[in-house]
Amino acid sequence: MNGIHDTGGAHGYGPVYREPNEPVFRYDWEKTVMSLLPALLANANFNLDEFRHSIERMGPAHYLEGTYYEHWLHVFENLLVEKGVLTATEVATGKAASGKTATRVLTPAIVDDSSAPGLLRPGGGFSFFPVGDKVRVLNKNPVGHTRMPRYTRAKWGQWSSTMVCFVTPDTAAHGKGEQPQHVYTVSFTSVELWGQDASSPKDTIRVDLWDDYLEPA
């Protein structure tokens, strides 16, 4: 979707400053939020692409003003209500409804086993593009989740490598199954992406893109 999260090439945000010795966590509550994500994924409350798409659906002002882990907390509070795991009242009060009991005890071993497969998948059909082929990113504006950056659309690049098969985010985020596809690392010149006035015209930008995002030259 064309949202505030997809800001590559946009103006007006200022430089990105790197803070020396930046702490991993600024507040204790951030540690709790981080530990909740693998637990919720292991319990199949939602998948990683649903998680990302929930962040994309945040209001623009909230997205820009919120911190990294505030984005995660927003997902937990909203997606778990959408999934029927929690109620809005439970989220607002911080108290579980009476009579609710856990269905199982989540152990570190369960979390490790559930995360081990990652998003890599076997198969996915044949690879459409041989290495070195020139490819074009489709020019489309999906209203749902996608991993196709807006700044790459309708641009020409060269396929430099294949990263085997992964879960397709565009379907997994919307209850349409994993539908694994090949993922390609596509190289773009900065001039192709940003035009003749690119600030670093000799740069090459490499983007990982799924089969469905590409067409041959």
Curated annotation (Swiss-Prot):
Which residue spans traverse the membrane? Answer: none
What role does it serve in industrial or biotechnological applications? Industrial production of acrylamide is now being developed using some of these enzymes.
Q: Which SUPFAM superfamilies match?
A: Electron transport accessory proteins
Query: What Enzyme Commission number(s) does the record list for this chain?
Result: 4.2.1.84
Entry coiled-coil feature ranges: none
The UniProt GO MF terms for this protein read:
nitrile hydratase activity; transition metal ion binding
Alphabetical keyword list = Lyase
Record's catalysed reaction(s): an aliphatic primary amide = an aliphatic nitrile + H2O
Instruction: Report the top EC class in one word.
Output: lyase
The Swiss-Prot or TrEMBL record describes its family as follows: Belongs to the nitrile hydratase subunit beta family.
What role does it play? NHase catalyzes the hydration of various nitrile compounds to the corresponding amides.
User: What does the record note on quaternary structure?
Assistant: Heterodimer of an alpha and a beta chain.
Protein name per Swiss-Prot or TrEMBL:
Nitrile hydratase subunit beta
* Taxonomic classification: Bacteria, Pseudomonadati, Pseudomonadota, Gammaproteobacteria, Pseudomonadales
Name of encoding gene? nthB
